[in-house]
Swiss-Prot record:
This is Succinylglutamate desuccinylase. It catalyses: N-succinyl-L-glutamate + H2O = L-glutamate + succinate. Transforms N(2)-succinylglutamate into succinate and glutamate. The gene is astE. It comes from the Bacteria. It comes from Photorhabdus laumondii subsp. laumondii (strain DSM 15139 / CIP 105565 / TT01). It is an enzyme of class 3 (hydrolase). Its cofactor is Zn(2+).
Length: 325
């Protein structure tokens, strides 16, 4: 039985074994702590499936675990592997009750009881336990890569969102993002309930939400499209050299405004197939509800994650400015 099937059938912990050079410990269902016997100087959290129907990152992490188990990939750093929303994965849904990636930093307490509220509390707990591990707490380099795929297609297929923080991101982290061959970086400037923001704020990790392409069902992903990102992840874990950037220049965007849906009358005035990072004309009314209208105003001319179907109180889109770098 393949590892993905074992994960979905709640059997992975009983069947997955590793070489003696790796100390493996399951902290919760779908949460695996891996510590090398030879102490590393970096601690990594790599997560996928925070949204259950974003399958390509889950398949990539399964492949990574298979190579570690076979001994074909060496473990040189402390790693916490997280498969986020397992019940949603099993039903090919984004979430069962509420969006898990809006709940971190204790925000889950503001949501009704349900699958995601319980999982957010559990994931916060296991990350605390990981960073309290003596071999982990002694490291001064902490990174978090939260792997996602997007609901819609994009002008920039692969990009990363960086959480708002008062300290600069390390040069090494930014170079790794550059060399992973993503197309764009998006900088948040407000706090959020995302997993990446939680790791940044609570543990001082260099953290990002990495969008790898359009969401597809299990088994329908062409994983060769993500090979450079996969190689970059393997390089992090094994301390192997990754190849330099191949693509054109990395673009940088700043989040200027969030479109927050607060009423059932909310509408987006763009076609359903509008691509992420579409540039819109000055003065265009992109969204409205009974008491508010959102119009495009320079420099925030690019739309990201437009979604009129979100629940009231949640973000229905981001308006971005392109930084000239």
């Amino acid at each position: 039985m393949d590892l993905l099937t074992l994960l979905l059938e709640k059997k992975l912990a009983d069947h997955l074994t590793f070489p003696e050079t790796i100390n493996a410990h399951w902290l919760a269902e779908g949460v695996l702590q891996l510590i090398p016997h030879e102490e590393g100087n970096r601690s990594l959290v790599i997560s996928a499936g925070i949204h259950g129907n974003e399958t390509a990152p889950i398949e990539i992490l399964i492949q990574l675990l298979a190579q570690l188990a076979e001994g074909t990939l060496a473990l040189k750093n402390n790693v916490l592997i997280i498969f986020g929303n397992l019940p949603a994965m099993r039903t090919n849904r984004r979430y069962l009750h509420d969006d898990l990636n809006r709940m971190f930093g204790g925000r889950y307490l503001n949501f009704p009881l349900g699958n995601e509220r319980s999982r957010a509390a559990e994931l916060e707990n296991v990350v605390n336990r990981f960073f309290a591990e003596p071999s982990v707490s002694s490291t001064n380099i902490r990174w978090h890569i939260d792997l996602h795929t997007a609901i819609r297609a994009s002008h920039h297929e692969q990009f990363a969102l960086l959480p708002a923080q008062n300290r600069p991101f390390s040069a090494e982290f930014m170079q790794w993002l550059h060399d992973s061959d993503i197309d764009a970086l998006v900088y948040h400037r407000e706090k959020a309930g995302t997993f990446s923001h939680f790791l940044s704020e609570k543990f001082g990790a260099d953290s990002c939400t990495m969008e790898m392409g359009k969401a597809m069902p299990f088994g329908e992903n062409d994983l060769t499209r993500f090979q450079k990102i996969t190689d970059a992840l393997y390089g992090l874990i094994s301390l192997s050299q990754i190849t330099a950037r191949i693509k054109f220049e990395l673009k940088h965007y700043q989040v200027i405004n969030s479109i927050i849906k607060s009423h059932d009358s909310f509408q987006l005035h763009i076609p359903a197939d509008t691509l992420n990072f579409t540039e819109l004309p000055e003065g265009f009314e992109i969204a409205s509800q009974h008491d508010h209208h959102w119009k495009i105003k320079f420099p925030a001319k690019f739309i990201l994650f437009p979604n009129a179907e979100v629940a009231n109180g949640l973000r229905a889109g981001l308006l971005l400015a392109l930084n000239k770098k």
